[in-house]
Amino acid sequence: MRIALLAGDGIGPEITAEAVKILKAVVGQEIEFDEALIGGAAWKVTGSPLPEETLKLCKNSDAILFGSVGDPECDHLERALRPEQAILGLRKELDLFANLRPARLFPELQAESPLKENIVTGTDLMIVRELTGDVYFGTPRGQRKDDQNRREGFDTMRYNEDEVKRIARIGFETARSRSGNLCSIDKSNVLETSQLWRTVVLEIAQEYPDVELSHMYVDNAAMQLVRAPDQFDVIVTGNLFGDILSDLASACVGSIGLLPSASLNSEGKGLYEPIHGSAPDIAGLGKANPLATILSGAMMLRYSLKREADADRIEKAVSTALEKGARTADLGGKMTTSEMGNAVLAALN
């Protein structure tokens, strides 16, 4: 198993180092990591946030473990050269159209949630977000002057039926592997794009008679996520709505330092990363929480490498470490990044 290791910027090298430590402890010599530059670190050396060498490595690897991108020293660059463009480029080049973001409340961390205990207890959901279409990629887009010489910005929200079909199937398959309940979230009372979305999802539902499908408007879904998050198991939605709702769900369960993600293509190749950013303000200080990256490694084992038992083992070790009181600063503790990794390592054994 060959893994492309893209540590990136900010806290990326620190948190990926802990994930690699755990993965090697679980899998041993069967897994090998090939490092490459990406983001601001790559731009400083090559002049590109996504060098051809890095892209080639990713295409030839079994999976990608990604740290973070984002560097204030690159804020002056034009959009195409900014570190954040690297992740967009990888999604496009590898056709990583399906983003899976679990949001699970660890019982040991109920006090970290901003929601009341009786509301948030039992929250364990998965958001399946379409990642390569919608308003983020639709054209035309830009800025111009209107007929009265006023500045205006414009974007295009667009989906075709094939894009909706393939993400819907991922949603149904994910629901089938869990509780059998899927909620499709759209804005079909207003948007033509969402009307197509709902129509196609209903068509695909005929292929999954064992999965119970419901629909919800995105504004109501946002309210329901903070009112009664335990009503959801699997959510499938578009790029824009998924971007917003997944961040909201992450806040419901506590620190974003706990939440992993997977971005998959139709062949099962995936990019695995924590949902948080590069946090340049604490880079190199040993304050970052590595658990989201460690859990991203577990998702990599499950979805791309088909090692379910190993993934379960890592997730159980994280839970055990938290149960024994392991806490980094974001969780109200004093552990360093490496100490948290060592706590998970000890729990493995």
From Swiss-Prot:
Binding site for Mg(2+): 219, 243, 247
Binding site for substrate: 91, 101, 129, 219
Record-level Gene Ontology MF annotations: 3-isopropylmalate dehydrogenase activity; magnesium ion binding; NAD binding
Subcellular location: Cytoplasm
Principal subcellular localization: cytoplasm
Catalytic activity: (2R,3S)-3-isopropylmalate + NAD(+) = 4-methyl-2-oxopentanoate + CO2 + NADH
EC number(s) from the headed UniProt entry: 1.1.1.85
Pathway(s) it belongs to: Amino-acid biosynthesis; L-leucine biosynthesis; L-leucine from 3-methyl-2-oxobutanoate: step 3/4
Cofactor binding remark: Binds 1 Mg(2+) or Mn(2+) ion per subunit.
Top-tier EC class: oxidoreductase
Pfam families assigned to the protein according to its UniProt record, in alphabetical order: Iso_dh
Any Gene Ontology CC annotation: cytosol
Cofactors (names): Mg(2+); Mn(2+)
GO biological process: L-leucine biosynthetic process
Site (Important for catalysis): 136, 187
Record-linked SMART domains: Iso_dh
Assembly description: Homodimer.
Cited function: Catalyzes the oxidation of 3-carboxy-2-hydroxy-4-methylpentanoate (3-isopropylmalate) to 3-carboxy-4-methyl-2-oxopentanoate. The product decarboxylates to 4-methyl-2 oxopentanoate.
Official protein name in the record: 3-isopropylmalate dehydrogenase
